[in-house]
């Protein structure tokens, strides 16, 4: 088994949130075995900017579920959705 790369869209709960701080909190929340390869930002609307981390996880049962759950628990996160998944 190899690894899987997933681009995950993380919507903050406010356009006023400090995205750098949110990015740090997302990195700290990662479950064991997962790592972030990079972040992109996507202007959504009305000043709201989504974070799009590319997360690397082992290819196994559950896939990105543990990462999604961890991100949902981070203060300031409104929603989490997997945008794209592929094997490395």
UniProtKB/Swiss-Prot annotation:
Gene3D superfamilies attached to this UniProt entry: 3.30.70.60
| Nuclease keyword on record | no
Entry-linked SUPFAM superfamilies: eEF-1beta-like (SSF54984)
Write the record's keywords in alphabetical order, separated by commas: Elongation factor, Protein biosynthesis
Any GO molecular function? translation elongation factor activity
The superkingdom listed in its UniProt entry is Archaea
Q: Does the keyword Protein biosynthesis apply?
A: yes
Function statement:
Promotes the exchange of GDP for GTP in EF-1-alpha/GDP, thus allowing the regeneration of EF-1-alpha/GTP that could then be used to form the ternary complex EF-1-alpha/GTP/AAtRNA.
Cited HAMAP family: EF1_beta
Family as reported in the entry's similarity comment: Belongs to the EF-1-beta/EF-1-delta family.
Q: What is this protein called?
A: Elongation factor 1-beta
User: Which gene carries the instructions for this protein?
Assistant: ef1b
């Amino acid at each position: 088994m190899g690894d899987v790369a997933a681009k995950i869209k993380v919507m903050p709960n406010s356009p006023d949130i400090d995205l750098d701080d949110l990015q740090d909190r997302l990195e700290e929340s990662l479950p064991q075995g997962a790592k972030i390869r990079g972040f992109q930002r996507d202007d959504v609307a009305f000043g709201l900017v989504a974070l799009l981390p590319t997360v690397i996880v082992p290819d196994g049962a559950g896939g990105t579920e543990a990462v999604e759950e961890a991100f949902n628990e981070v203060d300031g996160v409104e929603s989490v959705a997997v945008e794209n998944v592929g094997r490395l």
